[in-house]
Curated annotation (Swiss-Prot):
The keyword Hydrolase applies. Keywords: Hydrolase, Plasmid. It comes from Clostridium acetobutylicum (strain ATCC 824 / DSM 792 / JCM 1419 / IAM 19013 / LMG 5710 / NBRC 13948 / NRRL B-527 / VKM B-1787 / 2291 / W). Belongs to the isochorismatase family. It comes from the Bacteria. This is Uncharacterized isochorismatase family protein CA_P0030. Its EC number is 3.-.-.-. PANTHER family: ISOCHORISMATASE FAMILY PROTEIN YECD, PEROXYUREIDOACRYLATE/UREIDOACRYLATE AMIDOHYDROLASE-RELATED.
Length: 187
């Protein structure tokens, strides 16, 4: 992989917030993902790259999607502070925060606008969950024409199978898959 063009590349970190990271994940724990993602955030900000921290939140629950489904959406508990970014990334300067109300980070946010205004054509994606927030954002990014790099060891899912499926069958159709060390070497 060639070096990343920092001025045209953004790191997009999905849902590394207290209420999501605390859940059970595989193949990596929330703690492992936070450790890798925080290294990426620090490295990207040190190089002056655009870093976007995305979280899901609700004002009163009425602003969230509620479609009719065959299976129940696994509702996360929402104690006070559930939607706060984890401390490892919450106080890093020069990051841009986006709040979404659904799985993907594009719909209903200004993510595309902010990326285009900065001349960004490549997104490096990480976060939780591989098969929900990261995957949906990746599909939306693909539809918007962005190049994508998925940091496989800086994301995780509810199960090994979900993570493996998305990384094996979906992400290769949308972009390139790398690990944290490979990305850090390309900065």
């Amino acid at each position: 992989m060639e070096n990343l063009e920092i001025e045209k590349t953004a790191l997009v970190v999905i849902d590394l917030q207290k209420g999501i990271v605390a859940g059970e994940h595989a193949p990596y724990t929330g703690k492992e993902v936070v450790e890798k993602a925080s290294k990426l955030v620090k490295a990207f900000t040190d190089k002056g790259a655009f870093v976007v921290l995305v979280k899901v939140s609700t004002i009163d629950g009425k602003d969230m999607l509620k479609p009719k489904l065959d299976s129940e959406i696994n509702q996360i508990k929402r104690p006070e502070g559930w939607d706060s970014y984890v401390p490892e990334i919450s106080n890093i300067k020069n990051t841009y925060a986006i709040t979404k109300r659904q799985w993907g980070a594009f719909y209903g946010t200004d993510l595309d606008l902010q990326l285009r205004r900065r001349g960004i054509d490549t997104m490096v994606l990480c976060g939780i969950s591989t098969g929900i927030g990261v995957d949906t954002t990746a599909r939306e990014a693909f539809q918007h024409g962005y190049n994508q790099i998925f940091v496989e060891d800086a994301m995780t899912a509810r199960s090994r199978e979900e993570h493996a499926y998305v990384c094996k069958y979906i992400f290769p159709r949308l972009g390139r898959i790398r690990n944290t060390e490979e990305i850090l070497e390309q900065l």
